[in-house]
């Protein structure tokens, strides 16, 4: 599973976003791969998209099968890991959606699709392993 971050979702919905072209190009590279959106990321994205029109683009993309909305942390009963991760990185003031994504990718077959450099340079798994990214960050 490739878990999409809000930075990517905003860029996919808002063509005026500086990263919109890169998001579309990367989406094309993911054809045939399963993309997921977590509820915390969906909530964060909803608030970042400033107009109803942009939110409608997101909803239609999800309804059209662009990604599935899932709750992987709850499915693995790993919410406690999210709290531990937030405590571990509290000096960096991470948001809940980022913590949730990191814990969601504890499974070896998953990665995060993001433009947020903290996933490459700051955030780590609870065991200290690097967070797996769907694409290298520029």
Residue ranges, per PLM feature:
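Active-site-proximal, substrate-binding regions of enzyme catalytic domains
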Residues: 10, 46-74, 78-84
């Amino acid at each position: 599973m490739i878990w999409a971050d809000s930075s990517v979702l905003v860029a996919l919905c808002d063509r005026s976003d500086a990263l919109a072209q890169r998001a579309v190009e990367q989406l094309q590279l993911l054809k045939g791969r399963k993309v997921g959106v977590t509820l915390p990321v969906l909530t964060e994205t909803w608030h970042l998209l400033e107009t109803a029109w942009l939110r409608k683009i997101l909803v239609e993309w999800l309804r059209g099968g662009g990604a599935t909305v899932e709750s992987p942390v709850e499915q693995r009963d790993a919410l406690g890991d999210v709290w531990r991760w937030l405590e571990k990185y509290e000096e960096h003031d991470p948001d809940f959606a980022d913590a949730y994504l990191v814990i969601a990718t504890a499974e070896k077959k998953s990665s995060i699709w993001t433009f947020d450099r903290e996933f490459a340079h700051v955030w780590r798994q609870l065991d200290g392993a690097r967070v797996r990214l769907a694409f290298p960050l520029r």
